[in-house]
Amino acid sequence: MTIDTVILDIEGTVCPITFVKDTLFPYFLTKLPSILSSIEFPLSTSSSTNDDPIIQILKQLPESITISNESVFSYLKNLVDQDIKDPILKSLQGYIWEKGYEIGDLKAPIYKDSIKFIENFNKKIYIYSSGSIKAQILLFGHAEKDQESINLNPFLKGYFDITTAGFKNKSESYIKILNEINKSNDPSSVLFLSDNVNEVKSAIESGMNSYIVIRPGNAPLSDDDKSTYKTIHSLDELTL
């Protein structure tokens, strides 16, 4: 088996699964009220000419939601609390996180073995996450290494999210990615790494190779899963 392309999940694979839920999500909800308070509600049709990126994102919500900043906050907080993969939410989160990274509030705790792999794998690496592509680029652009912020994006070939590839538990999403990266005729040369069993199963159904990455804090695997799928605990274990 010759692998020349690796697709990486983010949460629970290259960084702790707790980073998103314990750091990024709370940061978003902390900053959101002050941002919403600066916007005039209800959003009128005249807002369509406003080039404020926040307003342009919020305009995609149903009018029944954008009647007040309280209703918008309640709606978005519910999506966050339920961990619903909503594209509008992801866009807004990406914008707010960008500001957090820029001012140094946020740094991404990428695992050391993941940084090492990304920096030294001399073939193609793609990212596929439910988080927006913008959020992915921000995260890898502000990876923490030796207490400094480093940019890993130059080592990455491209990015996919639920708006460009589809949901990660669907095999057709991986087939779409194979087409996008010109690997539809050679899917076995592609390896997808994820902490999620359903994602790994879907990737395998597309013809890719796929391993489950076991990290501290990840959901425990059943004995059946451990016997069915190849597992690794670190990207250092890869021999490609």
From Swiss-Prot:
Substrate binds at S129, S130, K168. The keyword DNA repair does not apply. Monomer. Its cofactor is Mg(2+). This is Enolase-phosphatase E1. The gene is UTR4. Belongs to the HAD-like hydrolase superfamily. MasA/MtnC family. The lineage of its organism: Eukaryota, Fungi, Dikarya, Ascomycota, Saccharomycotina. Bifunctional enzyme that catalyzes the enolization of 2,3-diketo-5-methylthiopentyl-1-phosphate (DK-MTP-1-P) into the intermediate 2-hydroxy-3-keto-5-methylthiopentenyl-1-phosphate (HK-MTPenyl-1-P), which is then dephosphorylated to form the acireductone 1,2-dihydroxy-3-keto-5-methylthiopentene (DHK-MTPene).
